[in-house]
């Protein structure tokens, strides 16, 4: 690798190569888990004792607790039990165009993206950091609309923006606006990809490919009715956990789509995964966009659709819950015993082919 190409941001093999190169420098057990959000605890495996607290206070390590105690808007649960496990996820958003339709823009996306990542490891999101990089010349009207979208989605998700930053760069040095958010949530029940094993059922929470297709429509000024699926997934995830469905792993199918998620799971678990083509719902509008531009819907990004592995005995309960939110949720496959790290796509006639991990320049700046 001599220089960075657009393909290095596409969610496929080139991106995995880049991540390995960069983050191997910071190698630790938490990073190695490769979940959507890092699962951490403060003060090690237990509560800080009095001497530890004194030492930590001198080193500034208790600033989080102290700041929360001084903030009268925080609930009591937010300032206790720093030895609990938490999930943290950060993401930067460079969506182009910054407005996809009347409902979805970079503001809504930046909240849903980070909040959903925290939800995917079984955490309840509580706090959000918010940082803007704004290009000189962005209209205040656009900025206000984006800010209102952020506020609306934070209220829906039940998260507070607790810190932030704003930078302005000269005209021509950016593309209207970039946003970074970091979500912070308390673990309800940890769901980690390292626990994927033979016999688990694979489900998807809805139809696939709509966000990527919506971006293509806007960039090419096409007449099409396809809308992004961008949404916060808190209701779906919390319903599954509240009903004690045995969810083993979850992943939102963003860059690289369904294909990227399944291939990552196959690689991490060392197991084959089979999925059934007729069980995966793809809307006709998305199929049309894929045919026009030569994409596979399995590789198109989603921003409000997630994939999950559950115990076989719980698959119908999981499906019933998910279909309350999206009738297109479905059971799409299972984890096999073969240790070859492949994703196998089987059609209605029994013919099979490998669903490869995405490669090359897919669709840059979709989130």
Positions of predicted regions on the chain:
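Short, compositionally biased
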Residues: 214-229
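Helix N-cap motif at beta-to-alpha junctions
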Residues: 310-315
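Active-site-proximal betaalpha loop/short-helix elements
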Residues: 19, 28, 135-137, 226-302
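Extreme N-terminal starter segment of soluble prokaryotic enzymes
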Residues: 1-4
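Acidic, Ser/Thr/Pro-rich beta/coil linker or hinge segments at domain junctions
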Residues: 324-367
